[in-house]
Amino acid sequence: MIELRTYVFLDSLQPQLASYMATASMGFLPVPGDSSLWIEVAPGMAVHRLSDIALKASNVRLGQQIVERAYGSMVIHHRDQSDVLEAGQRILDHLQTREYDRQQCVVMWNEIIRGVTADHATLINRDNRKGSMILPGQSMFIMETEPAGYIIYAANEAEKAADVTLVEARAVGAYGRLVMCGKEGDITEAARAANEALKRLTCRS
């Protein structure tokens, strides 16, 4: 039995998120403006068949595939939304399920820290080498989701809504983690947009 944990369609990858994803991509790199689909399933090995189905169904490119024992995730992208949606539908048909049967998103952590200190900023920057750096004095938005893949959707919608800097968007493992920084007003707006986006997702209860 394959469980659909995450199924998230991104209509247009924002510049920072696309670049961040490209730093970790082992496949074909996404570019800003691409449509993208992030799928996470359990058990992890099931993702191989789903990648095969998607790539044979349309012109999508496979940006990333991560296979763990418990969970497997895949990211496909293409400039044309219809190609991405067609590949996604073929996967759903194979699983004999619907998009809305994905697992419910639970926000495990959601907080804004204002006026980050120099010591704190340095430690965060040393720990993270894929995104941008946080500067002392900036405000920081941190979020954690379960399943992990939903954090990508939150990051994309937050970047659409405000002039913020993406520090981290980790969507692998049991929990997804997002870190963004910027001016206090911008961070407040980004946090609002991220939370509202996740609330709009229709999932099984």
Swiss-Prot record:
UniProt key word Transmembrane helix: no
Task: Describe the location of the BMC circularly permuted domain by residue ranges.
Answer: 3-100, 106-205
Compartments (UniProt record)? Carboxysome
Q: Where is this motif: Gates the pore?
A: 68-69
Annotated signal sequence is: none
Q: Which Pfam families match?
A: BMC
Alphabetically list the UniProt keywords: Bacterial microcompartment, Carbon dioxide fixation, Carboxysome, Repeat
Q: What is its main location?
A: other
One GO-annotated biological process of the protein: carbon fixation
CDD domains from the entry? Answer: BMC_like_1_repeat1, BMC_like_1_repeat2
Concerning InterPro entries, the annotation shows: BMC_CP, BMC_dom, CcmK-like_sf
Q: What's any one GO cellular component for it?
A: carboxysome
Keyword Membrane among record annotations: no
Subunit info here reads: Homotrimer. Forms a dimer of stacked trimers, the same faces interact. Probably forms a CsoS1-CsoS1D-CsoS2 complex.
This molecule's function is given as: Part of the carboxysome shell, a polyhedral inclusion where RuBisCO (ribulose bisphosphate carboxylase, cbbL-cbbS) is sequestered. It may control transport of RuBisCO reactants in and out of the carboxysome.
The record's note on its domains: Contains 2 BMC domains, trimerizes in a staggered manner to give a hexamer; each subunit in one trimer interacts with 2 subunits in the facing trimer. Each stacked hexamer can form a pore of about 14 Angstroms in diameter. Dimerization of the trimers forms a channel-like compartment, accessible via an open pore. This channel may be large enough to accomodate transport of substrates into and out of the carboxysome.
- Tell me its family: Belongs to the EutL/PduB family.
Under which name does UniProt file this protein? Carboxysome shell protein CsoS1D
Species source reads Hydrogenovibrio crunogenus (strain DSM 25203 / XCL-2)
Q: Which gene encodes it?
A: csoS1D
